[in-house]
Amino acid sequence: AEDGATHYTYEDDSFETISTRIAKVVMFICFWGFIFSITGYIVFSNLKRYDFGPEGKKITKDAPYFRDIPSNKDLYRAYFVANEYKILKNKNDIAGAIILKWIKDGVISVRQETKGKILKKEESVLTIIDENPKITNKNEQKLFDLLCKQSILEADGNKTVDNKKLKKWCEDHYERVFSWFDSVLKEEKDKLIEEGLLIKKKATFLKIFKYDIYEFSQELREDAVQIAGLKRFLLDYTLIKEREAIEVHLFEEYLIFAQMLGIAKKVAKQFSELYPDLVEQSCFYSYDNFYFVNAYAYN
């Protein structure tokens, strides 16, 4: 009965065959896992992280003039708001604004120093006056610590920042330098969330993926309008017919915020023409010192 029957024989797969199949499955999973990871990163990095309300994030260039200091004179709050509402020219300008704030607070000063053994010349340097200032912002403290570490004790007892030494450090650690600005924004963001001015909400992507989104309060929206108004006011200052005399303390704040907004040079030039003596009554002493800080922050 078995003569005409067809016989089927089953042989176990060899070890190599099984290994090859497993390898193919693993490669398939890894490939698509990689594709999904890249796709997810691209999608989520482009998702809206902030809700600016029905008025949106655009602030008109014709914002009404604002003659006071916005954001309750909080430089970091103004910096965060101006950055998110695209009012800033360059987010790196905050460094120069902080240095000007330190000069105003008596933490550091700008002085002239004679450099060179043969060809002597006057050079502006930053001198540290208070080595233990009361600084509450963590990233501001990091910047101050950096200046202290890159400073030298002069023969006259003054502790001055070594410009060349600081520049070389920044060149060698440029990634840390650039990440510092993001850290400043992150620290202020966390503070605004804690204060209830940024409201955390849940959003959904494709009805599956949930992520956090932060709603700007009306108060921060008003900050943005005021910052844009101050920027316009400072840029148009010479064109304003009915302008009031500026008090010294307000003049100092104007220059600090102008530096943060990236319009420092133009504003200083206007003020120097209108009020050539006012700067001498201020903590900056001369427009040359102000220009030095402006250039210092970029170098």
Please name every model-derived segment:
Residues 1-299:
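Acidic, Ser/Thr/Pro-rich intrinsically disordered cytosolic tails and loops
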